[in-house]
């Protein structure tokens, strides 16, 4: 199911932990749609370069299986771990920070990917936190 021009529901709910159900509920699906729209904005800021999604929505079971916290924004469909093949994670983080995107968090994780998120609620103001792990 296409959520936007470049992002599908399958892509944003994919997991290698196929033994667990990773189907979002209605509220999570709405967040995933907002996330897909936001990723389109990120793609524009990055000059239209392809964005590879490593991980986005995670059901509780999937989130537990990967050892993430219950408070992870992935749990509710508000975060994605991405790679941009022609850019380093540092370049992605810098481009996002320099933009006027309404990101909640942008995190360079282990110099392998970039975690990017939107506010948990549509009406909530973004925190605009930038971190390096």
Located regions from the model:
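Glycine-rich, flexible loop/turn motifs
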Residues: 3, 62, 71
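N-terminal start-of-chain detector that recognizes signal peptides
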Residues: 25, 51-57, 86-91
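Extended, low-complexity, intrinsically disordered C-terminal regulatory tails
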Residues: 40-67
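Amphipathic alpha-helical interface surfaces
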Residues: 31, 35-38, 62, 78, ...
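Generic non-transmembrane alpha-helical segments
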Residues: 38-49, 91, 95-101
């Amino acid at each position: 199911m296409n959520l936007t021009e470049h992002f599908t529901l399958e892509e944003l709910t994919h997991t290698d932990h196929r033994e667990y159900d990773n189907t979002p509920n209605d509220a999570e699906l709405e967040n995933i749609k907002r996330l897909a729209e936001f990723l389109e904005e990120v793609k524009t800021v990055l000059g239209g370069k392809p964005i590879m999604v490593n991980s986005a929505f995670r059901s509780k079971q999937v989130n537990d299986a990967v050892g993430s916290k219950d408070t992870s924004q992935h749990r509710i469909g508000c975060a994605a771990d991405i790679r941009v093949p022609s850019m380093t994670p540092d370049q992605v983080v810098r481009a996002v920070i320099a933009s006027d995107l309404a990101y909640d968090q942008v995190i360079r994780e282990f110099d392998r990917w970039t975690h990017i998120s939107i506010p948990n609620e549509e009406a909530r103001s973004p925190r605009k936190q930038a971190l390096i792990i």
